[in-house]
Amino acid sequence: MAIDENKQKALAAALSLIEKQFGTGSIMRLGEDRSMDVETISTGSLSLDIALGAGGLPMGRIVEIYGPESSGKTTLTLQVIATAQKEGKICAFIDAEHALDPIYAKNLGVDIDNLLCSQPDTGEQALEICDVLTRSGAVDVIIVDSVAALTPKAEIEGEIGDSHIGLAARMMSQAMRKLTSNLKNANTLLIFINQIRMKIGVMFGNPETTTGGNALKFYSSVRLDIRRIGSVKEGDVVVGSETRVKVVKNKVAAPFKQADFQITYGKGINIHGELVDLGVKNNLIEKAGSWYSYNGNKIGQGKNNVCNFLKYHPQLAAELDKKLREMLLHNTTRTESNSLVRDDEGTFDE
């Protein structure tokens, strides 16, 4: 489209003035923005990384993870921390619930000696700590556990039974406005864990809602709904849970995907089980009866034995992970092989 020469000169002068006043990159043409390829951190779950579309959670953004009690919210965030620390990133955990178990975190692969941890007294203190860490530019990942535990100072100083309508929502709204630009400039990922509540008197539609008002919903680039959908048993003993995560909002890729995976108690996400399932579905692993083969070589009989084989052969597991990511994340043609990534209706992608 041809633009009048006088308009072009006026536009160039305006852009130059804006950049002088606010800095280079403060305004640009959208197609020139090389930062559109968003840097991501793996969630620790291959199927969830694929469901997110970008290969993980986006840096410089706000992410909300919510669900019922004991659904795996904290476990998922600790897996994110473990993955980030392996890449040399600095992480912080704002434990507003005062319930973080360092032994459990260590079992999931978190380097607790290098994990920054704070147990704030008030919601304002927690959010201010987040802002200071972000503006330092030195912290890459911040977890807040949880929004429901971010109690305003006025509520703590008041008496039980006092009315504080909308206080937490106003606090969160103000914090979101302040944090968003700082997170982008520092390229820091901020993850809020949230709980669900039931709306009273809802006859139709979903009665569930999250705490802390609507601001977090709007400012989040990614929102994940995590649910426990079953149990994992060895004989009669329950050793883990079947977990489903729905991407209910996604600003960096297509939303409404679902990912199913197992969480083993005390160990975290069963990443080797995901590799086996996705490998079979994508014809990277051959299955004949109960035997599994890779590149023509048998690697085990039964899924549990194959998982143990991959556990003790990390190079093979890494090779399989790399091939699956290249196939499912960078392949523009969608195939039936995206089996563990499901759409909002619960049907498999085709």
From Swiss-Prot:
It comes from the Bacteria. Its main location: cytoplasm. It is found in: Cytoplasm. InterPro entries: AAA+_ATPase, DNA_recomb/repair_RecA, DNA_recomb/repair_RecA_CS, P-loop_NTPase, RecA-like_C, RecA-like_N, RecA_ATP-bd, RecA_C_sf. Coiled coil: none annotated. One of its GO terms (cellular component) is cytosol. Keywords: ATP-binding, Cytoplasm, DNA damage, DNA recombination, DNA repair, DNA-binding, Nucleotide-binding, SOS response. ATP binds at G67, P68, E69, S70, S71, G72, K73, T74. The keyword Signal does not apply. Gene3D superfamilies: P-loop containing nucleotide triphosphate hydrolases. GO terms for biological process: DNA recombination; DNA repair; SOS response. GO terms for molecular function: ATP binding; ATP hydrolysis activity; ATP-dependent DNA damage sensor activity; damaged DNA binding; single-stranded DNA binding. It holds the Pfam family RecA. The keyword rRNA-binding does not apply. NCBIfam families: tigrfam_recA (TIGR02012). HAMAP family: RecA. Can catalyze the hydrolysis of ATP in the presence of single-stranded DNA, the ATP-dependent uptake of single-stranded DNA by duplex DNA, and the ATP-dependent hybridization of homologous single-stranded DNAs. It interacts with LexA causing its activation and leading to its autocatalytic cleavage. Belongs to the RecA family. This is Protein RecA. The gene is recA.
